[in-house]
């Protein structure tokens, strides 16, 4: 009974009919070990999933719990684990991707219309599924007008938000940048459940960003970067 049983049934049906599908998993301080455990990965691979996206918990909303953000050690470990699973050193048969830690392969943040944007249930065009601010709505604006809205243009003007792509996000790792963009462009909160001032949102990320910075710099320096990947930035 419940959601778990429904998901298991859906996966079984997809596998039975040969439909390629993947998973979407949010990792937190409390579950990161469980959802990256080799036994769990083999389980979802056996259920038929061939790829999956891992999403770092984002403290979005008035009732968010910043204490659920992974520890520095957990984040460093998931980087290693995800990349190990993608190597030929195992037979798991599942290809995981990490939305927060794979920035190197897509040139950092892809939001704000650089490669994608999000439309919520009200039609508000937001730069990212985690960033609920906007100045345009699909009901009243064309796609071109949405892409040209001030907040999206501010994104494009500033991307990449960090040359270290282990610090790609203007909220989580560079919270001062999102605050500046939202305030300068006059974008309004579009969170339908829990409208939130950008200062309050980013305030929950400041300590995390400060502590993650030296870890990210060390890991970035240790990486063997063969070339810069996919840098479709606005020309400056």
Label every PLM stretch briefly.
Residues 130-236:
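Flexible mid-to-C-terminal extensions adjoining Fe-S/redox cofactors in radical SAM and related proteins
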Residues 23-24, 95, 155-156:
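Short, hydrophobic secondary-structure boundary micro-motifs
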Residues 20, 57-127, 168-177:
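A C-terminal junction/extension of Radical SAM enzymes
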Residues 1-55:
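Radical SAM/AdoMet-radical enzyme domain recognition
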Residues 8, 38, 76-83, 144:
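Generic alpha-helical structural signal
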Residues 31, 61-62, 135:
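Generic structural signal for helix capping and beta-alpha/helix-loop junctions
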Residues 1, 69-76, 136-141:
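Short, conserved loop/turn and helix-capping segments at secondary-structure boundaries
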Residues 28, 66, 131:
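Conserved short-loop catalytic and cofactor-binding motifs
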